[in-house]
From Swiss-Prot:
It is found in: Endoplasmic reticulum membrane; Microsome membrane. This is Cytochrome b5. InterPro entries: Cyt_B5-like_heme/steroid-bd (IPR001199), Cyt_B5-like_heme/steroid_sf (IPR036400), Cyt_B5_heme-BS (IPR018506), Cytochrome_b5 (IPR050668). Heme binds at residues 38, 62. Keywords: Electron transport, Endoplasmic reticulum, Heme, Iron, Membrane, Metal-binding, Microsome, Transmembrane, Transmembrane helix, Transport. PANTHER family: CYTOCHROME B5 (PTHR19359). Pfam families: Cyt-b5. It comes from Rhizopus stolonifer.
Length: 131
């Protein structure tokens, strides 16, 4: 089966609850059947209907399961003239959280300042007091 190609103008005609298409990563999805099932409510989908919803989709941070479910609604892709640049998406999946930094520069700066302060006290302030 050859994938259908749609213009953004064609997609924009499908923006109602009873006829809802969205574009995500330059792929066109007919999510009409999913509107009532969407855990975030139908309003958020209708708001993004008929346009490129890539940014909104990625900002929410959908699960792998949601991404897999999306594929069953795929009906084609966006034509070259309508395409947007691909977003650089860094998806954080469960169990793959980025490593937390082990410390900060304060761990070096504060002890260094304490040592400098002690040396100034011992070699500058104390000798002046004994003069």
């Amino acid at each position: 089966m050859t994938a259908k190609i749609f213009s953004l103008d064609e997609v924009s005609k499908h923006k109602t609850k009873s006829d809802l298409w969205v574009v995500i990563h330059n792929k066109v999805y007919d999510i009409t059947r999913f509107v009532v099932e969407h855990p975030g409510g139908e309003e958020v989908l209708v708001d993004e209907g008929g346009k490129d919803a890539t940014e909104a989709f990625e900002d929410i941070g959908h699960s792998d399961e949601a991404r897999e479910m999306l594929e069953e609604y795929l009906i084609g892709s966006l034509d070259e003239a309508s395409r947007t640049k691909e977003y650089n998406v860094n998806v954080i999946r469960a169990g793959e959280l980025p490593e937390e930094k082990k410390g900060s520069s304060l761990r070096i700066i504060l002890p260094a300042l304490a040592i400098i302060g002690a040396l100034v006290y011992k070699y500058v302030i104390v000798p002046k007091a004994h003069q």
